[in-house]
Amino acid sequence: PAWLKALPAPADGKLQPGQTYAGIPVLSQRLKALGDLRANGAPPARYEGGLVDAVKSFQERHGLTPDGVVGKGTLEQLNVPPEFRVRQIELALERLRWTPLLPASRAIVVNIPEFRVRAYEVRDGKVEMKVAMNVIVGNAAKTRTPIFDAEMRFVEFSPYWNVPPSIARGETLPRLRREPGYFDQQGFEFVGRDGRVVGGFSEASLDAVQRGEMRIRQRPGARNALGDIKFIFPNPDNIYLHHTPTPQLFKRDRRDFSHGCIRVEEPVALAKFVLADEPDWTEERIVQAMAKGRSATLRLREPFPVVIAYTTAVVRDGRIHFFPDIYGHDKILDDALRQRSQSLSASGLVEIGVKSKY
């Protein structure tokens, strides 16, 4: 009954605490059904008290800022029908069914739609989450972060950033032609095929980069696109975890701003986990290496798995959380499963399972 009709849009576009709202009875009923509102009795006359707290709980479970304000994003999520959420859970379980058991004592897992990374440790047969933080992933429209797994092998302090050719041609070169001063401002340098730094800024060097005869590299420093630490798990797509000079973006609800690599909110905490088997690498030493301004790479004694995953339904502390299907992978998987089921039904066969890259 709580979903027989959609919640109406607030009169001013946003429902603020203390305001009146025609949809309060339906909102209360819906939040009770979802388990976010535990109060009994008649709905309040105004949007206040326990109802605001229930909306905050709902927002927290759906990747939204828990401010209690019912704006466009919160209203959209509140109007999602239960059958859609059930399907999200089914798709999450389907993906989990494919996931191999990792024979490792440690692992890092990034969940793209959740914009979160978690680091796990296995002790005495029990899995313990040691670190969890927000991340920024690849832009959904242009540069999606791929789904894969690899082994963490290196940590690079004060890294150089070698501007990928696609970014150089599509973004960096056009800007440098418009704003030559941007070259020194960002700490760029030209590097030849032999790895040597080639002079300063010149139009000839820009043309050489365009032809693929040179590359642009950003020196370590405060403006470096990778921040002051990079976590390397070699893979064909050259995806890695790294810090960022623009931490303010972590305040956003939706965080798909990168060119594909994954930016981490708390690099020191992640470094402490990654280097836990290196007793000489204390937090103080990590911070010093990050601030040194001179690139240095450390090879890990024991590589361990890094999994870049994709699921829009997650259980945290016994509560289900849902996230938008930012890359459309749920829709692709849903369509594939339904088509397969229809095909098997038509042929009289029983479905055993299906695996997909989504």
Feature roles, as predicted:
Residues 1-358:
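Well-ordered beta-sheet/strand-loop patches within structured domains
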